[in-house]
Regions:
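12-transmembrane solute porter fold
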Residues: 35, 58-227, 239-266
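Short, charged juxtamembrane terminal tails flanking transmembrane helices
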Residues: 4, 265-268
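Hydrophobic transmembrane-helix bundles of small-molecule transporters
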Residues: 1-77, 111, 251
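Intrinsically disordered, low-complexity Ser/Thr- and acidic-rich flexible linkers and loops
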Residues: 233-237
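Transmembrane alpha-helical segments of integral membrane proteins
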Residues: 26, 227-232
Length: 268
């Protein structure tokens, strides 16, 4: 623990909060011009925050980690990509199951629970393995499996079986489990003990950014393909197309994320 924790950086907190809120509001309003403008304002806010934090004795976030620590930076980028690619999947599949397959909310929930069940079993095992094996390799493997699962989900149509959906969800959950725990291990293992707080905050921040970006990407895909219409049987084919496009984009993002995950360097 530091002998002199310093005063709380109120200006930095305001800049950071304003940048996050503005950027995420912009994502939610895409593809409208107002959304693009808000995203640009948010990016300017992030730039101002990083400039403000650089060189401070007691920064809210040690931004030098992003400049000097390749493992930390690439792990955070991989995390953002993974959460952007996967967080909105439950929303997409909920729409798919209830509208296109005519399942009840309870039935849809029973199908969707297959992914978190797999994650609950596999994630502790992956975390334990990452203590002994190179976490970057395990995380890259997990991201690759997730990309395969998302690619399979992008093939769904109104004739797909429930069993196929459950299998695809289990594959995606297995891959995500092998990514999340080793990736967090890589982030925490790449910093000194005195930086654990900053690294832990970064893990939470990139997770939230990825989750909100995921909803923004799906919203943009739906706006471009489906538009502002009520979901009725007349637009089910277009809805299915929008869902397939969303999963295809997610699979492509995971494929890109493999590069950052694999190229981060060795932790152990």
């Amino acid at each position: 623990q530091a002998d002199d924790p310093g005063d709380f950086d109120w200006l930095g907190a305001i800049l950071y909060t304003s940048a996050i809120v503005t950027f995420m509001l912009g994502i939610s309003w895409l593809p409208d011009l107002e959304g693009v403008g808000l995203m640009l304002v948010g990016m300017c806010g992030f730039y101002g925050f990083f400039r403000h934090q650089h060189g401070r004795d007691h920064p809210l976030i040690d931004v030098t980690l992003f400049y000097t620590n390749r493992i930390f930076t690439f792990s955070c980028i991989a995390s953002i990509i993974m959460y952007t690619a996967t967080f909105a999947n439950i929303v997409l599949l909920s729409l798919y199951l209830q509208y296109l397959l005519a399942l009840s909310p309870v039935q849809a929930g029973l199908v969707l629970i297959s992914q978190p069940l797999v994650m609950a079993v596999v994630a502790p095992i992956a975390g334990r393995l990452s203590d002994h094996k190179e976490p970057g390799l395990l995380a890259s493997f997990g991201m690759g499996i997730t990309a395969i699962g998302l690619a399979l989900l992008s093939t769904l149509d109104q004739a797909s079986s429930i069993y196929a959906i459950v299998i695809y969800l289990c594959i995606t959950g297995f891959g995500f489990s092998f990514f999340s725990s080793p990736n967090a291990n890589a982030i925490m293992g790449s910093v000194d003990k005195r930086q654990y707080g900053a690294a832990g905050g970064a893990v939470a921040t990139v997770r939230v950014i990825g989750q909100m970006a995921s909803m923004g990407v799906v919203s943009m895909v739906f706006a471009l393909t489906l538009g502002a219409v009520q979901i009725t049987p007349e637009v089910y084919d277009t809805l299915a197309y929008a869902i397939r496009i969303s999963f295809s984009v997610s699979a492509a993002m995971c494929a890109l994320g493999i590069y950052f995950s694999y190229s981060r360097g060795q932790v152990h």
